[in-house]
Amino acid sequence: MKRLEVSNQAKLPTQFGEFCIQCFREKGSNGSKDHLVIFTPNFPQNPLVRLHSECLTGDALGSQKCDCGGALQMALERISKEGGLVIYLRQEGRGIGLFNKVNAYALQDKGYDTIQANEMIGFKDDERDYSIAGEILEYYRIKKMRLLTNNPLKIAALEKYAEVTRESLIVCANEHNQGYLEVKKLKMGHLL
């Protein structure tokens, strides 16, 4: 926990059920970044875990361009029933930040896919770093988990810290995100 400062725990009643929250402040050369963990009290030894990167447009604004908001809601619903946690990482836009994400969205509006748009503004298709999630898993002493994901990069990253069994999390396509989901499957190797 050398690069993390840990907050107190607080209760968080939600539409999905009762959770607790705790913040992890990542200290680094670029200042600090706060990540949030939402968890059920007394979660099981083999908990459901959702590693979720921040998506303001999908999570808070209900954007139909992605599957993020739906995936987060589905994860919270399942976790409230089965026990576990969501590690909510502040890595907006697959790690490029909100400003750049909006610029990438503008390119998508012109017909470029999500990967092409990121590359056109100088980024890789995915700039995220999941090592901080590994440190958070170690903090909670999680050695085995059922990971709610379709992303093979998340599986590979977390297998360094715990035994991972993947459980799929499928959000229905709509007219606005169908192409995005196809790119995730065909170009990014997502297990959809």
UniProtKB/Swiss-Prot annotation:
Zn(2+) binds at C55, C66, C68. Transmembrane segments: none annotated. The active site is at D126, R128. Pathway: Cofactor biosynthesis; riboflavin biosynthesis; 5-amino-6-(D-ribitylamino)uracil from GTP: step 1/4. Pfam families: GTP_cyclohydro2 (PF00925). GO terms for cellular component: cytosol. InterPro entries: GTP_cyclohydro_II, RibA, RibA-like_sf. It catalyses: GTP + 4 H2O = 2,5-diamino-6-hydroxy-4-(5-phosphoribosylamino)-pyrimidine + formate + 2 phosphate + 3 H(+). SUPFAM superfamilies: RibA-like. Its EC number is 3.5.4.25. The keyword DNA repair does not apply. The keyword Magnesium does not apply. Catalyzes the conversion of GTP to 2,5-diamino-6-ribosylamino-4(3H)-pyrimidinone 5'-phosphate (DARP), formate and pyrophosphate. Belongs to the GTP cyclohydrolase II family. This is GTP cyclohydrolase-2. The lineage of its organism: Bacteria, Pseudomonadati, Campylobacterota, Epsilonproteobacteria, Campylobacterales. The gene is ribA.
